[in-house]
Regions:
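Signature of extracytoplasmic/envelope-associated structural regions
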Residues: 1-165
């Protein structure tokens, strides 16, 4: 059954996961605007032309997908406590022992998985809605303002899987 309820930023939740057997997780809070975005482009395209007229299209190389979100800045690091979001994505401080989700093929980089859950059952849907992004290389930038903001940027080297459960 399709949903009749439009979802809003109040319905979403982001969870970051490492690659251990029982993943170390961080539920993202203080997201501010709730501006999580992702793109799911599959491959480059080669346009086949015949003297300036499009006559076909072929798949080329896979593309690196992307995602991003912002959080209100509370701290850069917290090595003695619960850790910060920067600690999680950079594998530092409290999260220095985290394991990459990339395996040997991505051994030079620490990758994480990201789960975006949108509440559905509270609105009569048959389940909650999920987008799972795997093998994400995360980076961040900081912007001072009202409030200060940490922007998280993700390069998705794995898959983006959409589901309802």
């Amino acid at each position: 059954m399709s949903s009749n309820t439009v979802k809003t930023v109040r319905d979403g939740q982001l969870t970051l996961k490492d690659g251990t057997g029982t993943p170390v997780t961080l539920v993202v809070d203080f997201e501010g605007e709730g501006n999580f975005t992702f793109s799911d482009d599959k491959s480059e395209r080669l346009t086949i032309m015949d003297r300036g007229t499009i006559v076909g299209c072929r798949k080329q190389n896979d593309v690196v997908k992307s995602a991003s979100f912002s959080v209100n800045m509370r701290q850069f690091t917290d090595s003695g406590g619960a850790g910060s979001i920067i600690d999680f994505i950079m594998k530092t401080g409290h999260y220095a022992g985290n394991v990459s989700t990339g395996g040997a093929a991505f051994g030079d980089f620490y990758l994480i998985d990201v789960e975006f859950r949108v509440e559905g059952t509270d609105f009569g849907d048959t389940g909650d809605h999920f987008a799972n992004l795997t093998k994400c290389l995360a980076s961040y930038d900081f912007a001072e303002g009202f409030p200060d903001v940490i922007n998280i940027n993700l390069e998705v080297y794995g898959t983006i899987t959409r589901s309802q459960a």
